[in-house]
Every structure is written in C-alpha cells, then in structure tokens.
C-alpha cells in the first residue's frame, strides 16, 4: 500500500512518484490550495492538493485530523523561502495526484498537538491515540532500536537468549509478589517473578555460561515516576567471569548504545566505593553533574556550646556535614525556611545556615541564627574547610549519620537544580564495595542487594562471626543520579548460601522449604558465576529525556497500578473463582472498623 514511510521522503526522491499511507496530522486551506501534513511512525511530510485536479482536491477539502488515508503524488523541492528546517522532510513536499480515505475519525477525545495539555488519565485511556503523537512514537521506535542493539551486542559476544518461567514460586526479593492461584492445586499459588534471579543462576549450573534475556518482571509495590508494577529488564548472567570482567563487558555494551544511538562518547566509567559515595554525596547513586559535596565538620564543632552540633559531633553514630552553595547568600529567609522544611521529609529535625555576606569583614560579614554559639576560630575553620566565598551559603546537617546522608544528599540535588549548577550532560560511574547487610528497624539484618550475593574474600565462618562488617562483591552502574543496573558475584557454595540464610533469620527448615532446589543444585559442581540486570525502561527514559518511564512504555499503568484503557484490574467471574477455590472477602468499611474499635 506504500512505497515509502512519510518521514523518509527527502531531496533524493525529487521527481519520483511515491505512495504513502498514514494519518492526517493537520489540514489547512490556504488561498484555495489544501496543505496536508501526513504522519506515520517515521515522521511527517507535507502534501499539497491543487484545485487544478478538482476531483482529488474536493476529497482533500473534506479531511480532518486523524483520518487514515493513502496518497499518491510527485515529490518536489520546496522553494528556499519555504524550507522548514525543523522537519526531517522540510526540504521537500509532495504534489498530491491521488487520495483515498481508508477510514474517517470521530471527534478526538484528546488533544494531539504537543503544545496542548492532556491529563495522564486521558493519555492512558486513549493510549492508541497518544502513541500516534510524534514525541511518543519516536520514543517507542527508539526503544526498539535499543533492544535491537542490545541483542546484537550480546549475541555477538556469545550470550544465549534463554527464556525463564513466568509462573514460578514466591521468593523474598524485597517487594510484594503478584500471586496467581492454581486451579489444579487448590489453595496454592504461583508468583509472577520479580526477577529471573534464581533461574538464571540455575542456567549457569546447567552449563550455559553466557545468558541474557529481555524479560518482564513484576513487583507489587508503591509506585512513583520511575516504577511500574510490570517492567522490563536486560538480564545478564555469566560463568567464570570476575566482577571486573562483568563490569567491563556491560560497560562496553552501554557505551556502544550511547555511541550508536545518540552519538555520545561516555568515556571510561570511574569507580567509587559505596562508603565514598555516601560520604561525599549522601547517596549510593550520586549525580556527578552536580559539583556540590557534603563536607564533614564534626571535628570543628564538637566543642561548641550548641547541642544541635556538639551532640552528633560526639556521637559515634552521628555526623555533622555541610553544603557550601555558591551564590546562595541571596536566598531569602522564606526560601531558607522552605529548605528547612524540605529536609524534614528525609528525617532531619531542621536546617542551620550561615550566609557569607562579606568575607573581608570577618565576623561582621557573617549572618547566621546560630552565630552566637560559634567562636571566631570555629567560623574561620568552617570557611577554610568549605572554601566559601563572599555571597555563598553554608547549610548544616547534624544528626545520625544515615539521616544526615539522606537529608543532605536530597538537599544537594535540590540546590543543584535550584542554582543551575549541573555540569555536563552525561556522568556515568560504577559504585562498588557495598555492605553485604544493613540493619533493619527491629535490629535484625537484611541483604542490601539480595540473599544470593557473595561476600568479598570471606569464609562462611568469618561471615557468620561478623556479618555487619562484610563487604559484598556487588556493583551498580549509575548515570546522572539514576541506577541503570545492578549486579554481583553470586554465591556458588552451599555452605556459604546456608550461612547467609541463617544471618537473615531464615532457619534450615524455612530455607529448605523456599530454596531447597537451589541448595540442592549448589551441591553438584556449581561454577563461579556473576551477573547484572539493567532496567530497560529507565535507560530509555534517560536516553530520550522523558520525565517518567510511563512515557517510554507502550501501555503502562497509572501510579495506582491501574489501566484506564482496559479498566484493569477488574472483578473475576464467580464461576472462575469457584474453579480456583478462591473466595472474595469484602473489605470492612471505616464505619465498621470504628464500631469494632469502640
């Protein structure tokens, strides 16, 4: 039905007759000539209908937005004065010779113009229309190019594309599972996989030493801009490769993606330990475009007569750190109060500040509500430590170390945006040497990555003797403050795996019930293996500049995990529920809960 895509027509086709199909993006009658912008997934081209061809001109005059049409016409160069540099096809237009309306369109329920606003609900309800918009179509096409490039790279490096089960067993991976009731085994449930983690490890045990899969994963968790209940991973696992080798190979893949699709050279990725990232940036996924760093000053303020500072400064688990913001002294008291309110979101109790109004005036040039507690020597030491200059602002975080890191790390990002401090377009890095475990609120331990991550250079006995000191052989790839992917060397020894389960409070009986198949498989010559999983949606979001992964997925869910297009989730047929042995219990209303409480 067509000879070319609309967006592919260019000056090399001048003088040729072409056949195109697509949708009417816009139609207008200017001085008795109909100008039609025809759109398909590859772009838009202008078609001109002249009254000298009255039959086809009359049909063209009836066209409205989103009519689906076929046109035949002659490609001609536009006059220099009419060239549109903003369009890929802007040097040419098509003189329409024939026109067939393939289908008309009802009045549109959403605005198709990129400058017109539609609500998220409208866009998702009429997603098939939303996806016609060039901005959205470009992202979906780009996504396809990324997955194609990933497959070419991995296929070319000896990786095998192997599918793993979607109906599987629930395992503790940090989020709630989506459960699927079994009709055959009444009262029992499958779980949709949060990742193919255990199956890809089993593939390594099976001898398939280089595996990959572009795979759907499912997590029933609270959503935000970069989370969806179902999402796509680029899943990779290898045998007989060290963590450095896995990082090198996957870095090569990502650098190749950016070079091929964006013409961007990311350069070699620096490595940073988890401890350094938290100390300098308050985050294990630092945005290195932001030049601000957390500066420790506990040694300077530990003797001051101000409990807010000297308390954390003398607490082994406390921290006092500052941010020095160039030009920040111009902030009003109201704006500073907004910053103070902002850090409370992350557990901080408040925010002390110091303005350097005039460095040459000594203490008289300093303004701060806590200045009365600080000696001249302390102020001088703070200025030297931070390198603050006239017009700068120093912000203080003083609390438990984890609260200071989280609150000041978040404030660092906000200040970087507010003061337009970001430098460079792309700043990748590897974060390595993560703690293997971290404390839970009840004093227990949980795995920072997952329970199958191997420690660095420890025996099972050493690990159980001092688990909180263990460093995992894990690594995260970070770009512009977003975690692109994470991975680790896996445990390939059954004694080590059992030790980790015990540390996590999983006794031998529970371990056998949940992971017996894995523990059994580890007994039969399991090779050393390591891997990594990338969030495909997040990679596409970053590469296209989208604000949410919903804008790079064809049919995403809302932030409440619903689909306005299909009205999913929905109620099940009672007959189906009976076959499954499932009954629905209606949730109690707030009124009944109140009465019960009384």
Swiss-Prot record:
Pfam family, one: GAD
Domain of life: Bacteria
Residues given in the record as L-aspartate binding sites: 173, 219, 449, 490
Keyword Ion transport applies: no
Enzyme Commission number(s) of this protein: 6.1.1.12
Keywords noted in UniProt: Aminoacyl-tRNA synthetase, ATP-binding, Cytoplasm, Ligase, Nucleotide-binding, Protein biosynthesis
Root EC class: ligase
Protein's cellular compartments: Cytoplasm
Single GO term (MF): nucleic acid binding
Reactions the enzyme catalyzes: tRNA(Asp) + L-aspartate + ATP = L-aspartyl-tRNA(Asp) + AMP + diphosphate
Predominant location: cytoplasm
Region feature Aspartate, mapped onto this chain: 197-200
Binding-site list for ATP: 219-221, 228, 483, 535-538
Keyword Nucleotide-binding on entry: yes
Membership in a protein family: Belongs to the class-II aminoacyl-tRNA synthetase family. Type 1 subfamily.
Assembly and binders: Homodimer.
PANTHER family, per the entry: ASPARTATE--TRNA LIGASE, MITOCHONDRIAL, ASPARTYL/LYSYL-TRNA SYNTHETASE
Task performed by this protein: Catalyzes the attachment of L-aspartate to tRNA(Asp) in a two-step reaction: L-aspartate is first activated by ATP to form Asp-AMP and then transferred to the acceptor end of tRNA(Asp).
Name of protein: Aspartate--tRNA ligase
Gene: aspS
